[in-house]
Amino acid sequence: MIKQLIAEFRKQNGRHPAIFDHYEEDQNCLWHCLHMARTQNLCHAPEYLRPGKSEACAARSFFRDTRETLHAIVFEQFANSPEHREILLFNDNLACAFYTDHYNVFVTVRGW
């Protein structure tokens, strides 16, 4: 679901499709989302980034459904942050994951 929203965001901004075929890095993103949920702390994990990669993280209170919340994260939070926007739009390779707990949605996107 998050990959489709990022692809839609890229398309609306005139960017070509990103390559999302990175299972191992997607799992690393999921691990980071779980860590943020467990600690209830929005944080970055630079020590786990490989050279040349950048990371965007977000947390948002859960709306009525997961898709609506993820849409707000991509099209509002990430879109309105120059650094996060750059990661989504100007990296050819992206890995991402999200995790929903009872009250929040946590997202990690890594680009290179």
Regions found by a protein language model. Name each.
Residues 64-112:
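Disulfide-stabilized extracellular recognition modules
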Residues 1-15, 51-52:
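Extracellular disulfide-stabilized recognition modules
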Residues 25-70:
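Short, surface-exposed glycine/acidic/tryptophan-bearing loops
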Residues 12-28, 40-50, 84-101:
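Surface-exposed patches in mature extracellular/periplasmic domains of secreted proteins
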Residues 6-7, 30, 34, 58, ...:
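Non-transmembrane alpha-helical segments in soluble domains
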Residues 1-4, 19-27, 64-73, 78-79:
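Soluble non-cytosolic domains of exported or imported proteins
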